[in-house]
């Protein structure tokens, strides 16, 4: 994957609905000074914006973010070591209790789920650390 292009994910096979190994890359030279992302509820607008902003940060591209709903505040949360104790402050104690789990167990599950998901998409620790330091 070329470092000069934004990595937005991987192509999805239309027949199986599963990700392929083919990356979706975007040339930041095609960006203008403003962007608008529109779409139906649940169509991936926030996910696309997060990906674009993270990739911009990794390449030192500045951004001003207007986020009236607060969807993008989690951009500042980076846990490159994927340690359960890093996730624990963000676990809802009441939800954990209702699920019959301790906070520690819920944090361990969250850490494990994030680790598996990132690995599945080919995102390693070095990339997470670079984003944290961007």
Regions found by a protein language model. Name each.
Residues 1-43, 47-131:
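Basic- and hydrophobic-enriched, low-structure N-terminal and domain-boundary segments
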């Amino acid at each position: 994957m070329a470092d000069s292009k934004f990595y937005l994910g991987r192509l999805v096979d239309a027949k199986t609905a599963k990700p392929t190994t083919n990356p979706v890359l975007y040339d930041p030279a095609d960006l203008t000074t403003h962007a608008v992302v529109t779409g139906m509820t649940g169509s991936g607008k926030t996910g696309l914006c997060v990906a674009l902003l993270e990739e911009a940060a990794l390449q030192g591209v500045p951004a001003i973010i207007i986020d009236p709903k607060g969807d993008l505040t989690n951009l500042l949360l980076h846990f490159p070591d994927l340690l359960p104790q890093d996730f624990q402050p963000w676990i809802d104690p009441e939800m954990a209790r209702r699920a019959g789990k301790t906070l520690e167990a819920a944090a361990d599950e969250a850490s494990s789920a994030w680790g598996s998901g990132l690995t599945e998409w080919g995102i390693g620790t070095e990339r997470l650390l670079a984003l944290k330091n961007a």
